[in-house]
Each structure stands twice: as structure tokens, then as C-alpha cells.
Amino acid sequence: MRKTVILLCLTALTLSAAQAEVLLVENFEYTAGTPLTACGWTAIYNGTSATAITNGLEFDNYAGCGIGNGALINGIDNSYQPHKAFAKQTSGSVYVAFMLQPYIVTKQSYFFSLRDAISINNFNFVGRIYLNEQYQIGLSFYKSSDAAPVFDTQVLDAETVYLVVLKYTMIDGDKNDRIDLYLLDAYTANEPTTPLLSITNTTSCADIYPENIVLRSDDADDWIVVDGIRVATTWSEAVAAGTCPTTGTAHPTTDHVEYYTTPQALHLQLTADETICLFDTTGKCVYRETLPAGTHDIDLGKGFYVLKTSARTYKIVIS
């Protein structure tokens, strides 16, 4: 009897481990300034690159905190919709977690979604996450002409990093799958009982078998940063715990400049003399100096900045 109980317990543990699967981890560990299509993402609609690599975000106790860089969604061409694939899921739930900083939002539009297989004929962008000009987060199952997105009343802080979790649940039957959205300002290892927003499919779009995540830009004045994307079949795997680094993560570039950020500071490592220019989002030059090779620290307020060197231009986030 004891052996039978042990075997049953081991079988249950094995099944539980098999059911809890990490499908995708994207920490944007690429060179700053690189377009996503050079980093394993696919854009099939021939849009102009509007999403590139910037320095990353931090959210205490989250597994993606402070690893690699981040993706800056900033551009007017909404046909540039980089996709990244994961293993097709046909049952259960898919959880997508990511860090978000909505620094500038000038137009209501969706910036993130799921979809099924990539196709140039079907546009099944499902589980669309929106931001509007009031800095409120919203959700729709499918396109707004079928059903307007639903927005939460909370106004997000442009200088705060949030953890967003999208849950897609596949339910037996046609056009009845459900999406749930969670917005966290502090880490929790347990799935909240009540989501922030929840929608059941009542649109013209068929339910999908998710196998891609999609980023989307819609306005050149928007500055939205996404980082630390985790796709999994359980909350515990998608919203896994981690430790933020005690120092900033170095961001190598394609010239002789390496940088990292810490709260309200930019740190540079130069291998040759370099003229450094920093501009805020209004275009005002807030720092200009020719610096010798070596290490340099520049104090800055929170916000987005354009870092210009003699060879390249980088968009950076100071938290």
C-alpha cells in the first residue's frame, strides 16, 4: 500500500511538471538600437521598423528583472508588427507576463497581442492590450469594430514599471474562449482571484490556438517600453520569481560606447574619446560634453532620453 501511494504521488508530480511549461522567454539580450527583426522576431507586412532595442526595465522579485535590454515601441507605421513564435497550444490556458513602462502615450491603440499561426491572409490578433491618452490600460478580444476595448479606470504613472499578465483560456466549443488581464504594481507569486479585466469572445473572430506574441506601434510620439516577456502554461511559470541585480546591466553598442543605467543616472564606459549628447523627449539638449576614454557617470532625472554619439543614436530609459 505504501509503495502504491508513493507511486501515485510521483505520477502526480510528473504530470504537474509536464503541465507547467515555459514556452518562451524574451529578455531582449541584444545590442541597443537594433531592430527586432534582427533579433529573431518576424515582421511579415513590410512595415517600417518602429520597434528597437533600448535599455531594460526592473520590477522587484520578477524573474525578468534587470536582464538584458528592452523593446521600445515608438513609431507611426502600425503595419510593422514583429511576431515571436512559441509552441502551439490547443488546450488549457496560456499566460503571458511582461514588464511595462508607458512613458508617453498620445493615441489610443493596442501595442501587444496574441495570434495563431502567421498568415498574410488572416489577421487573428487576439487578446489585444491597449493604452489610451489618459494612460489607462484596456483590453479587447479582437478588433474594435467588433467590440470596443474595455478600459480600467486607473491612470498609470509614466515613471512606474508595471507587471502585466495576459491569460488566454481555451474553452470547448466555438467562439467562447476567454481572456483575462492582470496589472501588478508589486510582485505576487499567486494568481489573483479576480482579474483587472475579463472578456469572453463574442466577436466575428474564431477562437485561436495561440502560437505567437505580437508587438505593435501606432504613433511616432509614443514611448512605450516592454521587457522581460515570459510565456507559459501556468501563472507560477509565467510570473516566476527572481532577483534584480544590485547594479545596472551593461548595454554594449556597435561603437566604442558601453552604457548602463541606475536610478536617475547614466554610466558610460568609453574605449576612446567621444562627444556625448543627451536630449529629452522635447528635443532639448540636456547634456553635451566631449569625454576622454574611461568611465563616466551622468546624473539625470527620470524619463526617456536620446543618447547621441559620433556614430549612433540610442533611446534610453532612466528610472
Regions found by a protein language model. Name each.
Residues 2-3, 302-319:
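C-terminal tail/sorting-segment detector
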Residues 19-47, 244:
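Extracellular carbohydrate-recognition regions
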Residues 28, 98, 159-199, 229:
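Carbohydrate-binding surfaces in secreted/extracellular proteins
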Residues 34-70:
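Extracellular glycan-recognition surfaces and repeat-rich motifs
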Residues 65-136:
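Secretory/extracellular carbohydrate-interaction modules
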Residues 140-162:
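Short, aromatic/His-centered strand-loop micro-motif at the edge of beta-sheets
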Residues 191-225:
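Flexible glycan-contacting loops in extracellular carbohydrate-active proteins
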Residues 237-265, 274:
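Residue-level detector of functionally pivotal "anchor" positions at catalytic/ligand-binding pockets or at interdomain
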